[in-house]
Amino acid sequence: MKLTTRSRYGTRMLLDIAMHGSEQPVSIKDIAQRQGISVKYLEKLIRVLRKAGYITSTLGAHGGYQLAHKAEDIPVGDVVYALEEMEAPVECDEENPCCPRMAVCLTRTIWGEAAKAMYRKLNTFTLADLMRDASLCPKNACNISPHATH
C-alpha cells in the first residue's frame, strides 16, 4: 500500500511539533522550514489534525501549535488513519460495498484485511517511539534537507 504525502508529511509535522513544542507553541513557518514542506500544504494538514484532536493552536505573536496529548499517547496508525482520505487500499472492501462485482469478487475481503493489518502494525509505534529513534541519529545525520520528500 502506498501512503499519500498527507500521511508522511502529517506525521513529520506532528513529530516536529512534539520535538520542538514542549515548552512553547511551534510556528507553522518554523515547521515548514525544518521539514521542507510548504506552509500552504501544512495548513491543510493542520486542519485535519486539529479536527482529529491531535494538536491545539495558540493565537498571537508567540502562537503556534502544540500536541494535544503526550507523544506516548499518540499512535502513528491513528494519525495515518486520520490523514488518509481512504481507509483501504482499494475503494471497495467488505465494509464498503461500492463495486458492482461485489457479489462475485473473490479478492474483496483481502483488501480490508490488508488495511487493518497495516494500521495495527503502525499502532505499535507512538510519536514518542519515533522521537527516541531520532535521538539515536548521529549529530547532523538527522538534519532534514529543504527538499526532503519522505
From Swiss-Prot:
Record domain HTH rrf2-type: where: 2-132
UniProtKB keywords: DNA-binding
Originating species: Nitratidesulfovibrio vulgaris (strain ATCC 29579 / DSM 644 / CCUG 34227 / NCIMB 8303 / VKM B-1760 / Hildenborough) (Desulfovibrio vulgaris)
Pfam families in UniProt: Rrf2
A molecular-function term among this protein's GO annotations: DNA-binding transcription factor activity
The protein's name in its UniProt record: Protein rrf2
GO cellular component, one term: cytosol
